[in-house]
From Swiss-Prot:
Organism, scientific name: Pectobacterium atrosepticum (strain SCRI 1043 / ATCC BAA-672) (Erwinia carotovora subsp. atroseptica)
Reaction equation(s) it catalyzes: 2'-deoxyribonucleotide-(2'-deoxyribose 5'-phosphate)-2'-deoxyribonucleotide-DNA = a 3'-end 2'-deoxyribonucleotide-(2,3-dehydro-2,3-deoxyribose 5'-phosphate)-DNA + a 5'-end 5'-phospho-2'-deoxyribonucleoside-DNA + H(+)
Keyword DNA-binding: yes
Protein name per its UniProtKB record: Endonuclease 8
Binding site for DNA: Q70, R125, N169
Key word Zinc present: yes
Cofactor binding note from Swiss-Prot or TrEMBL: Binds 1 zinc ion per subunit.
Entry EC number(s): 3.2.2.-, 4.2.99.18
Pfam families tied to this protein: Fapy_DNA_glyco, H2TH, zf-FPG_IleRS
UniProt keyword annotations, A-Z: DNA damage, DNA repair, DNA-binding, Glycosidase, Hydrolase, Lyase, Metal-binding, Multifunctional enzyme, Zinc, Zinc-finger
């Protein structure tokens, strides 16, 4: 599943293509969204933003389109009138005079209003977004020590969007390597220095990934040029200590780590 940095980079491309422009053609695959097709034509796309792994598209008459890519959803930017050849199922087409944005394969799509947006179950449940630059390591540390999070193992906690939105499996792996922590630990077991190191890594790694990822290549892990230290490096040497990177399954996801320096 694409993680927060990939969703934010996709949103950046959508913003460049259609924000501030008037819609000339709108198409939705799902019957419940069909009534909005004619309503949205002539409206402007005011803003596109991410909340964790969800994407929100704001229109000039206060409608908000909610979409979540889940495992297989992907956005594409094309020229107006263009329909790329693909085996994916088209879900959304929002077209302006010169560009169009297309959503394929996703199924979690809803039309909301500014009034109903805050009541959406997913948006109510998620924690602060790791790519929100106003979020500080001190605030993350406070969150780690909240009663509902402090005794949860990091292997599961770092996948829980209620803790911090936008994290996922490769970020979980890389963050714990950076913090030199084994996945079975909990925040309640850490000393002050370890808490500070983990809190910084929880923000630095996702932001570094967002700032250093390239054009999507579907044959790679979401087009990553971000330098993985342990993810997908089973059997290789750890660059920090020379130990052997291992792979196991944690919370039903593959987990990569160096048992020698992650303790």
């Amino acid at each position: 599943m694409p993680e927060g940095p990939e969703i934010r980079r996709a949103a950046d491309k959508l913003v460049e293509a259609v924000v501030g422009k008037t819609l000339t053609r709108v198409w939705f695959a799902f019957p419940e969204l069909k009534p909005y097709e004619t309503e949205l034509v002539g409206q402007q796309v005011r803003q596109i933003e991410t909340r964790g792994k969800a994407l929100l598209t704001y229109f000039s008459h206060d409608r908000v389109l909610y979409s979540h890519n889940q495992l297989y959803g992907v956005w594409r930017v094309v020229n107006a009138g263009e329909s790329p050849e693909t085996k994916r199922d088209l879900r959304i087409r929002l077209e302006t005079q010169d560009r169009a944005i297309l959503l394929y394969s996703a199924s979690d799509i809803e039309m909301l209003t500014l009034d109903t947006l805050t009541a959406h179950p997913f948006l109510q449940r998620i924690g602060p977004d790791v790519l929100d630059l106003s979020l500080t390591p001190e605030q993350v540390c406070e969150r780690l020590l909240l009663p509902r999070f402090r005794r949860r193992q990091f292997s599961g906690l770092l996948l829980d969007q209620a803790f911090l939105a936008g994290l996922g499996n490769y970020l979980r792996v890389e963050i714990l390597w950076q913090a030199q922590l084994a996945p079975q630990h909990t925040a309640s077991q850490l000393n002050e220095e370890q808490l500070q190191t983990l809190s910084r890594a929880l923000l630095e790694i996702p932001r570094l990934s967002y700032n250093t990822r390239g054009t999507v290549d579907e044959n790679r892990h979401h087009g990553a040029i971000f330098s993985f230290k342990v993810f997908h490096r089973e059997g290789e040497s750890c660059e920090r200590c020379g130990g052997t990177i291992e792979r196991t399954m944690l919370s039903s996801r593959p987990f990569y780590w160096c048992p020698h320096c992650q303790s």
